[in-house]
């Protein structure tokens, strides 16, 4: 991604907290968090290290998710890193490693605060306040007697240690507690980190009351202070959805998996943002686009369509929070029968989550605005699906063509295709060959992809003329335009458009054009490197001879099938070299 493109993309972002992801071929390469997304992403135009410079150079897109606070951004960032394992994420942002809690994978697990968890451990976090976390872990050890010693110490104990004497451990190492009881204690501690605050708060409250009754007021005060930390542990911005939220009835306490849905409508396209909370933490989000219906209650109709289409073949969450009431009673009844609590929050924490989902939905409509602007500028009723084409080669060698696809302004990499073309140094002929291939496959029903609304060619009038000849000769009814690199002029059959540099429709075409170019160059380089490797491994065949062979025969495959006499006709190739080439290839 070029500096100019990065700055332009950053300028489109809101100055709000959130998480950003640098993507390469739709693969997450880097995840970061920011208090202000716009400034943070803009800073990558001037990278601070070679590692980050390489990451930015390879990235072809940026995705974001908005959050309410930097803490929520941290938690979402950590979960996305955990899920995607991005190549360029060495540690969490700002060179800080945030603490986690792990229960080790041992027959008698230990609990500990760590910044470097075991790969097979049960892990919770990260958490932003280590003191609060250590207070919670110490309280859990006191209440449930969980060990905190290393496996080496555990395996070499023959009598209880000091931690048993002070009430921090139940001494499973010497059999002071049986395995079943210890496992039950571990399960209770795990439930606390899953969001069940009462697992720890209730026994502490009882202990505090007992101390007060016994007039041990100093001890009662200490327990009270710890209890305050425990009761706020899942509520002070650490949790997105609390399973102990007092604003709802007792039935919500069993809601571990919760989806939050927000709808934004822009013209004829609707965006549904889905936030997913698991055990009280915001762990994932996604965006989905649908055709917006006409008439009243459009958002309600969109939600109804989304609920049936999205959840028909997926696991249902325990609850779904919606920005609008779905207008179809059958959908609500279906979800109710499946045990899903669907509701529209009025106030409180859940209402804030709805606001957050709506922010993400509105942000997701930026690409829709670009598509609408492009359709407007070209006189189309709608442009949802665009395919881009480009040709790449080195002086007529290793000629390849790319075919990329964008749907609703975003790259759809599963619809990308590429093709090896005839090795000749003629850009127009090769573009015609590439488009003929695509058009014939479409007309013959051999391409499972839908026809695009628009084709974008990387080039000028010559490339566009060649592409249109291929499309029209084949009888494929698809509109075709070109985007020239030098002046960023949009060439159409009816004329040339010189749009402003900040025009949203131009940004969309540039992304399609640049992605087609990148995909073609990538494929060409892989083919070229293969050719170079095969011929360069033949003794006695230098660079000039390699070029002469490829000029004469067109490809390594043709060199391989050539007779020895034909090989000897090439300047620089004698009988011995011809024998070597034939034997090696």
From Swiss-Prot:
GO biological process, one term: SOS response
Stored InterPro entries: GIY-YIG_endonuc, GIY-YIG_endonuc_sf, GIY-YIG_UvrC_Cho, Hlx-hairpin-Hlx_DNA-bd_motif, RuvA_2-like, UVR_dom, UVR_dom_sf, UvrABC_protein_C
GO cellular component: cytoplasm; excinuclease repair complex
UniProt entry keywords in alphabetical sequence: Cytoplasm, DNA damage, DNA excision, DNA repair, Excision nuclease, SOS response
GO molecular function: DNA binding; excinuclease ABC activity
Domain UVR per the UniProt entry, residue ranges: 198-233
Domain GIY-YIG, first and last residues per copy: 15-90
Superkingdom, natural source: Archaea
Pfam short name (any one): HHH_5
Compartments where found: Cytoplasm
First-listed, main subcellular location of the protein, grouped into a coarse class: cytoplasm
SUPFAM superfamilies in UniProt: C-terminal UvrC-binding domain of UvrB (SSF46600), GIY-YIG endonuclease (SSF82771), RuvA domain 2-like (SSF47781)
NCBIfam families: PRK14668.1 (NF011262), uvrC (TIGR00194)
Role, per record: The UvrABC repair system catalyzes the recognition and processing of DNA lesions. UvrC both incises the 5' and 3' sides of the lesion. The N-terminal half is responsible for the 3' incision and the C-terminal half is responsible for the 5' incision.
Family as reported in the entry's similarity comment: Belongs to the UvrC family.
SUBUNIT field: Interacts with UvrB in an incision complex.
Protein name: UvrABC system protein C
Species of the source: Haloquadratum walsbyi (strain DSM 16790 / HBSQ001)
Gene: uvrC
